[in-house]
Structure formats: C-alpha cells, structure tokens
Regions:
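Short histidine/acidic/glycine/proline-rich micro-motifs that form metal-
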Residues: 29, 76-78, 111
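Terminal interaction module
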Residues: 5, 103-163
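Long, hydrophobic N-terminal alpha-helical segment
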Residues: 5-10, 17-61
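Short, flexible active-site-proximal loops enriched in glycine and acidic residues
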Residues: 57-59, 97-107
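Helix-adjacent hinge/juxtasegments
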Residues: 72-100
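Short, conserved beta-strand segments within well-ordered enzyme catalytic domains
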Residues: 23, 69-71
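Core structural elements
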Residues: 62-69
C-alpha cells in the first residue's frame, strides 16, 4: 500500500492475492472528518460481514484520500451473493453519509500535475483523442476484481490500460 493509505480490518499483507476486490472512486478528496466516518463505519461493517455464516476476512482501505478499496478473502469458499450485496449496500450508505459520489462507475480518475482528477469516462476519452491528456498519464482502474489485479493493474499509464 502507499504512504497515503488508511487501513481498517485485516492487514492488507494477510489478504490472499486471489481475494475479491472492489475499488470505489470518490468524486472528491475525503476530509479528515470523512476519513474518521469511513473508518468508524468500516469497522462496524467488517465485524458483521459474513458469507455462508462465516465472517469474511476483510480489509478496507482509504487510498490516496480519494479511493476506497475493499478486499474479501473467503479462504477458498465462494462469496455468497448476499455478502456481495451487503458490501454494495454499505457503500451506498457511505455515499449518503459522506455526501460524495462513490457508486458512479462512469466516473474515472487520473493523475495530473500531482493531483488526482475525476471526470466522466466519455470526457476522458475525448481528452485523450484531442491530446489534452497524454497516454502516459497515470490512470486508476476501478474495474479490478482481485487483489492480484489491484497490485498489477490498478495504477498504470493510460496506454497500458483497458482505455
């Protein structure tokens, strides 16, 4: 994890590389108060998040003050749909509590001039086509599905991404 990561739950290093992963991009940076709210609610969520009657070995990260990543290591079991639904419901609740967009999958993030910028996907495609955004610009892939993908494909230049 990076130096600007806040962690709740199981340490990231103890989560298996095949663990399920979801990354949510915030429409704006989190304030210190919002970070505290996220941590508080994440602790409660992780303590009761279960799949097939067993508590999920979960790790919750606030990354670069703009992203929330959830990792779920079910230790060989498949994660039940109800557990996945609970994580989505939790993120929708956080969105309401924080007053930020987290569930908008058409919102993408890039790094420009040492700042993370979020913009609609179609706008980014247009800026790439017009060369307003270089293909060497760092892109944050919100479509990863495992810890392994997170480690290899979450942060990468646009020209090496699915864009």
């Amino acid at each position: 994890m990076t130096e600007s990561t806040i962690q709740v739950g199981v340490p990231f290093t103890e989560i298996d590389n095949e663990a399920k992963a979801w990354v949510y991009t915030s429409s704006k940076d989190f304030t210190k108060v919002q970070q505290g709210e996220i941590k508080k609610h994440a602790q409660v969520f992780l303590a009761s998040w279960d799949s097939h009657g067993k508590i999920v070995k979960g790790s919750f990260q606030i990354i670069k003050n703009r992203f929330i990543a959830i990792f779920a290591d079910t230790e060989g079991d498949t994660m039940c749909g109800r557990a996945q639904d609970r994580s989505v419901k939790f993120m929708k609740e956080l969105e309401q509590i924080l007053g930020v967009k987290l569930m908008d999958r058409m919102l993408v993030a890039i790094q420009q001039n040492d700042q993370i910028v979020t913009l609609p996907f179609v706008e980014l495609r247009s800026k790439i086509a017009s060369k307003d955004v270089s293909t060497l610009t760092l892109f944050y892939n919100g479509l990863i599905t495992s810890k392994k993908e997170f480690l290899s494909d979450w942060e990468r230049p646009i020209d090496g991404s699915w864009l």
